Structures are given as structure tokens and as C-alpha cells.
């Protein structure tokens, strides 16, 4: 597995003393974020720790210089660096002035595909879940590359903040031959998802960060039209996703059902229980918890039913070693 994150592009958009410190750092290639806050020292973030990069504090003047070079932030306070996968987000005070910047390091993972190759080659809609910053978007880029370059599928990426395909007129090479539809407003992402189907005849739609009621409904509509969907959502695990009132619709939704006395006795449960309301628009789910380890649920509906009924929920733990060897073990988990 090869990991690429070109830090050279940060030179124009961070203070020079921060870049010099970063360039000398022994673990610079494992960096996930750089944080610049007014009146504080520059901070570097890794998966397992955070540390100060400089002794010198960031001033308002430093931030203004960075902002001038970065350019315009969109309505969700994000910007990108041209022809890269990096993302910059800003923090504003109550007067609308920028007082902090977060630089997210965009990565290209080449070779992570084999760990989920069977799911990629199948015709299954797949949902990737995990906490923010765990690597869902990097997985999605590699899935897009394999589907469009190797399997030769017609793939369209609906890119809300150019986070999947990077900033610029042309999608980043890491996404393969997939076409990209940019979203002008974060409130119109669901409309672009439907537009992609109606106008461009894709076989597969890819979308990052499904998070609103409208986007969930659009995902359901896409699945009902027979289009394969690859998406991601923020959640620590499938159990918490099923409890989320907005995102639970992606896996069929949950409703309260009252049983008769006889049914309750036969099921050995309470009279009022929770059941899956409908069909899931995703067939499989991939939980990303570690860098090279994923938990795979090959049947979302069976897994959700098991969670709601308190039964043992079977999943697969898949890991990739540094030498490329893949191990798969069954995980018997009682939710």
C-alpha cells in the first residue's frame, strides 16, 4: 500500500516559519492536520497525538496573509488548494472575522483496494462509516479509481466541497476516470445527486458525507432507481448509525411496534419493540476504525435486525499487513 500526501503545496498558504518547522519534523508524512489559531502556537495533529510545531505564536497578521493566498471560502467555511486533495477550513468569531484555520491533509491511498475488493467488484451499494478524519474519503477515492479504471464502470462523483476529487477544474488523478459534479451550495447536494442520474446515465454514484434528511432521501431514491451507490457517513459504528434519527433511513429506518401478548411471549420480549421499517438502500457496510483494519457487514438488513432484536451480530474483521497480506476473521458481537 502506497500513501501519498504532497506537503509542498502548503508552502504558499502557511506562514514560512511553520512550513520550515514542518519540513524538519521526523513524522511529517504521518501528519493529518495543521491548526493555526490566533494567539496560539501552530499545532500539528497525528492520529494518536497532538504537538506544537513552533515556539512562535500565530498572530492576526499571519492569518491575514494566509487567507489572502488561500482565496475564497465557500458557505460551509471550506477552501481547497488547486490540484491537490488538501482542504482548509476556517473558524470565525461572531463578527465574521477568521480567527483560526484547520488544514486537513488529503491523502491518496494506492493498494488499499484488495481488502474490500470483493465488495468493489460486486454490484452492491456500500456505505462507509467512521468518525471524522479516520480515512473514509481516502477509501472512497481508491474505490472510485478501481471502479472507473480497472472495472470500467461509468462513475459519477457528487462532490459537495471538492474533498473527494480535489480543488480545480479537473478531478484529481486518484479518483481515476470518474466524472465529477460539483455542488454550488451545500443545501443543494441532494438535487445534484438526482440530476446526475437524470442527465448523465451513471452506473454508480459516489457521494461523501451523507448527513441531512434531503441527502438521505436522495440516496433512497437513487437505490430505488437501480443505480449503485457508494457513500459515507459520520458514525462510530453501525449500531449508532441505526439510532441516528436522520441517518437511520439509509439502513431502512426504525419504528416502534406493539406486539400482542402471544407474540411477546413467543419472542420472549417486551410488548413494544423496535423493528426495521423498510429496505436498506445499502447492501453492505464498511466500518473504518484503524488505518489498515475494517469491519465489514455483508448484509446490512440482517445486521440491523440482529442489533434491534439483541441477537449476536456477525461481521468480518479484515486487516492488511505492511507486506500486503490480508487476514479475515469472523467477529461475533452481541450488541
From Swiss-Prot:
Transmembrane segments: none annotated. It holds the Pfam family Spore_III_AA. GO terms for molecular function: ATP binding; ATP hydrolysis activity. It comes from the Eukaryota. InterPro entries: AAA+_ATPase (IPR003593), P-loop_NTPase (IPR027417), Spore_III_AA_AAA+_ATPase (IPR045735). ATP binds at residues 130-137. Signal peptide: none annotated. Its main location: plastid. Keywords: ATP-binding, Chloroplast, Nucleotide-binding, Plastid. GO terms for cellular component: chloroplast. It is found in: Plastid, Chloroplast. The keyword Acetylation does not apply. Belongs to the ycf45 family. This is Uncharacterized protein ycf45. It comes from Cyanidium caldarium (Red alga). The lineage of its organism: Eukaryota, Rhodophyta, Bangiophyceae, Cyanidiales, Cyanidiaceae.
Amino acid at each position: 500500500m502506497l500513501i501519498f500526501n504532497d506537503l509542498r503545496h502548503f508552502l504558499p498558504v502557511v506562514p514560512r516559519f511553520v512550513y520550515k518547522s514542518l519540513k524538519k519534523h521526523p513524522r511529517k508524512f504521518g501528519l493529518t492536520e495543521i491548526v493555526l489559531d490566533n494567539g496560539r502556537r501552530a499545532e500539528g495533529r497525528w492520529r494518536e497525538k497532538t504537538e506544537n510545531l513552533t515556539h512562535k505564536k500565530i498572530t492576526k497578521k499571519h492569518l491575514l496573509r494566509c487567507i489572502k493566498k488561500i482565496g475564497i471560502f465557500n458557505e460551509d467555511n471550506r477552501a481547497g488548494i488547486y490540484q491537490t486533495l488538501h482542504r482548509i477550513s476556517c473558524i470565525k468569531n461572531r463578527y465574521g472575522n477568521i480567527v483560526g484555520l484547520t488544514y486537513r491533509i488529503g491523502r491518496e491511498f494506492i493498494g488499499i483496494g484488495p481488502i474490500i475488493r470483493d465488495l468493489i467488484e460486486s454490484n452492491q451499494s456500500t456505505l462507509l462509516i467512521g468518525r471524522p478524519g479516520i480515512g473514509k474519503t481516502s477509501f472512497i477515492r481508491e474505490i472510485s479509481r478501481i471502479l472507473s479504471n480497472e472495472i470500467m464502470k461509468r462513475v459519477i462523483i457528487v462532490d459537495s466541497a471538492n474533498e473527494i476529487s480535489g480543488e480545480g477544474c479537473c478531478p484529481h488523478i486518484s479518483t481515476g476516470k470518474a466524472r465529477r459534479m460539483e455542488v454550488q451550495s451545500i443545501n443543494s447536494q441532494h438535487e445534484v445527486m438526482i440530476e446526475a442520474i437524470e442527465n448523465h446515465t451513471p452506473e454508480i454514484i459516489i457521494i461523501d458525507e451523507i448527513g441531512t434528511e434531503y441527502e438521505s432521501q436522495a440516496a433512497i431514491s437513487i437505490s430505488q432507481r437501480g443505480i449503485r451507490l457508494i457513500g459515507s457517513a459520520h458514525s462510530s459504528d453501525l449500531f449508532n448509525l441505526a439510532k441516528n434519527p436522520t441517518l437511520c433511513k439509509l439502513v431502512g429506518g426504525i419504528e416502534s411496534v406493539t406486539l400482542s401478548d402471544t407474540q411477546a411471549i413467543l419472542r420472549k420480549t417486551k410488548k413494544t419493540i423496535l423493528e426495521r421499517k423498510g429496505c436498506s438502500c445499502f447492501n453492505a457496510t464498511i466500518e473504518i476504525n484503524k488505518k489498515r483494519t475494517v469491519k465489514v457487514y455483508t448484509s446490512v438488513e440482517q445486521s440491523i435486525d440482529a442489533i434491534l432484536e439483541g441477537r449476536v451480530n456477525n461481521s468480518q474483521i479484515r486487516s492488511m499487513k505492511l507486506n500486503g497480506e490480508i487476514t479475515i476473521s469472523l467477529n461475533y458481537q452481541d450488541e
